[in-house]
From Swiss-Prot:
Ca(2+) 2 binds at D180, N182, D184, Y186, E191. Inhibits multimerization of host lymphotoxin-beta receptor (LTBR) and downstream NF-kappa-B signaling activation. (Microbial infection) Attenuates activation of host NF-kappa-B signaling and production of proinflammatory cytokines, such as IL6 and TNF, during Zika virus infection. Reduces recruitment of host neutrophils and macrophages into the circulating blood and spleen in mice infected with Zika virus. Up-regulates expression of host AXL during infection with Zika virus and promotes Zika virus replication partially through increased AXL-mediated entry of the virus. Homodimer. Interacts with host LTBR; the interaction reduces dimerization and trimerization of LTBR induced by lymphotoxin. This is Lymphotoxin beta receptor inhibitor. GO terms for molecular function: calcium ion binding. Residues 1-20 form the signal peptide. Can also bind Zn(2+) with low affinity; the presence of Zn(2+) causes protein precipitation. Does not interact with Mg(2+).
Length: 210
């Protein structure tokens, strides 16, 4: 009797185990265990995070340096950048002709051109100003002209000096006091025109030309 009860309990135990595993009849339970082991494990791929670099702002001074246009050369002899403008083109023609050693036809020049050319003729350092030495040279030029005229009219008379050195010095001092309006020790072309010296020269040359 005890053996029958033990056998019944054993059968019930195996039946409970079989129902717990839910294995189909006739199928080896190890087959399911192998499938569970062979199932791939899917992992979410990790996307690498790229660091975001923020561009540093360019200093404003550096931008201005790159944006600045190339500067031109400095004006020649202190003249404005637009030297060949319509206002002084006639004067600049004589100026350029003198610098390039081009023969100048004074017969086709206006009175203003002649005045400017005469002024520039004595501007030896080409700074558009006449200093004391250049004024003396201009006076010597007048002096030589007078000597030449006197020698042509009186060929038999001996050569004589019209102005002494002291007279030339006094004349230069007088001209400076009369023409040097701003007192800088120079006579520029504007001061020359305002002084009325060209009127005296026009009296010496009625035709307006030497």
């Amino acid at each position: 009797m005890k053996q029958l009860a033990l056998l019944t309990l054993t059968l019930l135990y195996f039946a409970a185990v079989a129902l717990g595993q839910r294995v189909a009849p006739g199928v080896n339970p190890g087959h399911y265990q192998q499938q569970q082991q062979q199932q791939p494990q899917y992992q979410q791929p990790q996307v690498p995070v790229q660091p975001q670099y923020q561009q540093a702002p360019v200093p404003q001074q550096q931008q201005q340096q790159h944006q600045q246009p190339p500067q031109g050369h400095a004006p020649h002899h202190g003249q404005p950048q637009q030297v060949l403008n319509a206002n002084n083109i006639q004067q600049e023609k004589a100026h350029i002709a003198e610098h390039m050693d081009v023969p100048i036809d004074t017969s086709k020049m206006s009175e203003q051109e002649l005045q400017f050319h005469y002024f520039k003729m004595h501007d030896s350092d080409n700074n558009n100003k006449l200093d004391g030495c250049e004024l003396i040279k201009s006076l010597i030029h007048w002096h030589d002209e007078e000597k030449h005229k006197h020698a042509e009219k009186n060929p038999d008379e001996p050569d004589k000096t019209i102005y002494t050195d002291e007279q030339l010095e006094n004349i230069v001092d007088s001209v400076m006091r009369m023409m040097d309006a701003n007192g800088d020790g120079y006579v520029d072309y504007a001061e020359y025109r305002r002084s009325g010296v060209e009127e005296n020269r026009r009296d010496d040359y009625p035709n307006g030309r030497p």
